[in-house]
Structures are given as C-alpha cells and as structure tokens.
Regions:
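Conserved catalytic core of the tyrosine transesterase superfamily
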Residues: 1-177
C-alpha cells in the first residue's frame, strides 16, 4: 500500500520469498475399497459408473456427457469430449464392459445419454448427481472422501505404478501436451 501511494520507492516485502511447503500426497482408492464399493452397489447404473470411472480415468463432466452411441463395446472404447471440446478415445476394461451392458439392458427409457436418473423422466445424470451418489456409497462403507476425481487419480497412479510412461498417462487423461 505504501508503495502504491508513493510513500516509498520499493517495498521491502519484495525481498521476502514464500516458504515452500510440502504438498500432501493426494489419496487414491485402495483395491479393497474399490471391491467394497462394487459389492455394495444396489443398482446396475452405479456399478457401471464406478467401473467406467475407475478403468478410464475420465473426468466426471466427460462421464455425464457420454451418450450410448459413443460407446464401442467391440473395441471397448468410447469417445469423450474433454476440456476445450477436445475429442479423445478412452478404453475401458472387460469388467466395465460387462457392467455397462448389464446396465443398458436394465434400462427402460429411450434417453440417448449413457447415465440417467433412476426414476422417471430418466433425465441425463448431472455432475452433482454422480458426486452425491458416490459420496453416499462411500459413507455407507465408512470410506472417506469418495468422489469422482479420486477414481481418475487412482487410475493414473495405478498406471504409473505398473510402469506406464507419464506422457502416456497424460495423454489418456486428456492433459494438454
């Protein structure tokens, strides 16, 4: 303020550097917790949602914008539109494929959206709906802070732990190069 008001030429605060603090390592979801979440799902939609998030690492916004027509079950891939409307292909595992197919067979609506609400009028699921549902599932099992982005972080961490190059992981996650 003194510098802005021309009472002093240069603030002595400019010589003071911020102290670097350690960034806490962000938590991932354990394999056991993933299995417990799967086992606790009471509807096919939630199971398909968990497996798709876990196996692809897509953002929750990409998940809710997916349409059934963008899923290729033969190739086990789907086209997602990420940040800045960037299109990319992501691949899901066999478990996700089975649970997605079970979920789609159980649906009685004609909505083109991949994930819809459980009750009529079966609207496209919103980001908040996914977040709330995952939080509820986690709380039922006394699992702390279960949210969509944690699945993304878990997928990336597992891929790196298994030896995948970080550049490849960034590409899968849709990070700009």
């Amino acid at each position: 303020w003194l510098e802005e008001e021309d009472y002093i030429l240069k603030s002595p605060m400019r010589r003071i550097h911020k102290i670097k603090t350690k960034q806490p390592v962000k938590e991932t979801i354990s394999d056991e917790a993933i299995e417990r979440l799967r086992d606790n799902c009471k509807c096919a939609r939630d199971l398909a949602m968990i497996d798709l998030l876990y196996s692809t690492g897509i953002r929750v916004g990409e998940l809710v914008n997916l349409n059934i027509s963008e899923i290729d079950f033969e190739a086990r891939e789907c086209v997602v539109f990420g940040k800045g409307d960037k299109e990319r292909r992501v691949y899901f595992d066999a478990k996700a494929k089975l649970h997605l197919q079970d979920y789609l067979r159980s649906r009685t609506d004609a909505n083109p959206a991949l994930f819809v609400t459980l009750d009529a009028p079966f609207d496209r699921l919103k980001i908040s709906g996914v977040e709330i549902r995952l939080r509820e599932l986690g709380r039922e099992l006394n699992l702390d802070k279960i949210h969509p982005h944690k699945f993304r972080r878990t997928m990336a961490t597992r891929a790196i732990d298994k030896g995948m190059p970080i550049e490849q992981v960034q590409k899968i996650l849709g990070h700009s190069q």
